[in-house]
């Protein structure tokens, strides 16, 4: 990175971006606004039809929004000529779910191609392509054709190709969905390294919560063509506010209770037990919060379910507890959890005689 690159603090800025396709009854994008910080990793999540791919196509200029403003690397796209837009797009690489490598070209040839389109001499393009293939872990695979490469290797070639013209932004659209879990993790590790070593801004579209938690700095939740929630990874994943965010994250954090317990739960207090879900993160995940509660207040607790996981390098854990319902004891528990930075949610009340 040079001084000019470091001077740019915002990679992409979108304001009130809207797009409606001909014949559609509702907009694909409805006044979408966001600031994508430079040199960070951003994940856009949402259900199918939320508008994610349309937004991506607007960011790489494959679609033109009906209204709103789009600024890329401090340049207002609407003020640029077609030629200037083409030059700007050299700094924006796109990786698709289908890698779209040219079957008749080797890995080296595929990575050289974008440079050759810009008139880069073959010798220079070849050296640059070899450097990039080495950077993505494909030294020795330069002469392999796409059919001779695994899915993960083809995706690595696609990443190298996207960086061929020294792209400062990588747009990735469901790029791991066709890969097995281990290969996906390997590709995510590669992207983290590229972000760290090259300072590349990465914007991901994904439905895979594993992708989100592994590498994201910021998360954006889309519904009906708008961002309904956005913020830093831990803020969004550990403290979701919008119902759509909670729905998307349910499979990541919420371990299902047995049906016989769920069916017996009451939303209002009853004589019996109260069930509480706890979410530990950061410092609280390493403290004896439950042991301290029992010592301080002598409350009988049963652990019904538990799980440990991680967000990037941060550990978090979930527990589902059962305790005899008493308003005074419940208030003491909730105060104790809040004091120690533990997110506590009352799941419901289990009538006396129902087994937990």
Tell where the protein language model's regions lie, with residue ranges:
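Conserved ABC ATPase "signature" region
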Residues: 76, 112, 116, 123-140
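Conserved signature/switch motifs of ABC ATPase nucleotide-binding domains
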Residues: 144-147, 165
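Catalytic Walker B motif of ABC-type/P-loop ATPase nucleotide-binding domains
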Residues: 170-173
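A short, surface-exposed alpha-helical micro-motif characterized by mixed small hydrophobic
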Residues: 212-214
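ABC ATPase NBD coupling module
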Residues: 26, 77-93, 117, 122-123, ...
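Conserved ABC transporter NBD signature motif
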Residues: 68-76
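Helix-to-loop junction immediately C-terminal to a conserved catalytic motif
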Residues: 60
């Amino acid at each position: 990175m040079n001084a000019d690159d470091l001077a740019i603090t915002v990679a992409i800025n979108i304001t009130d971006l809207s797009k409606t396709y001909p014949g559609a009854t509702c907009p694909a994008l409805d006044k979408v606004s966001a600031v994508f910080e430079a040199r960070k990793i951003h994940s856009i999540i949402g259900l199918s039809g939320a508008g994610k791919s349309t937004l991506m196509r607007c960011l790489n200029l494959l679609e033109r929004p009906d209204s709103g403003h789009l600024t890329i690397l401090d340049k207002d796209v609407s003020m640029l000529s077609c030629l200037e837009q083409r030059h700007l797009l050299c700094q924006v690489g796109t990786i698709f779910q289908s890698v779209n490598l040219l079957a008749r070209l080797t890995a080296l040839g595929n990575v050289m191609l974008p440079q050759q389109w810009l008139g880069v001499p073959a010798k220079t393009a070849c050296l640059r392509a070899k450097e990039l293939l080495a950077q993505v872990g494909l030294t020795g695979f330069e002469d392999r054709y796409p059919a001779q490469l695994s899915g993960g290797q083809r995706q690595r070639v696609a990443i190298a190709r996207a960086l061929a013209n020294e792209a400062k932004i990588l747009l990735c659209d469901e790029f791991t969905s066709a890969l097995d879990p281990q290969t996906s993790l390997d590709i995510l590790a590669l992207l983290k390294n590229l972000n760290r070593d090259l300072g590349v801004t990465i914007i991901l579209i994904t439905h895979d919560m594993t992708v989100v938690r592994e590498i994201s700095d910021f998360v954006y939740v889309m519904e009906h063509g708008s961002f309904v929630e956005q913020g830093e990874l831990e803020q969004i994943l550990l403290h979701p506010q919008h119902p759509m965010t909670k729905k998307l994250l349910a499979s990541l954090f919420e371990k299902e209770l047995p049906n016989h317990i769920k069916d017996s739960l009451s939303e209002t207090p009853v004589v019996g037990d109260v069930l509480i879900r706890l979410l530990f993160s950061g410092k609280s995940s390493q403290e004896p919060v439950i042991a301290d509660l029992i010592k301080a207040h002598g409350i009988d607790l049963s652990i019904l379910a538990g799980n440990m996981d991680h967000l990037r390098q941060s550990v978090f854990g979930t527990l589902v507890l059962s305790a005899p319902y008493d308003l005074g004891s419940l208030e003491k528990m909730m105060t104790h959890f809040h004091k120690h930075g533990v997110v506590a949610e009352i799941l419901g009340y289990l009538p006396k005689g129902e087994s937990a």
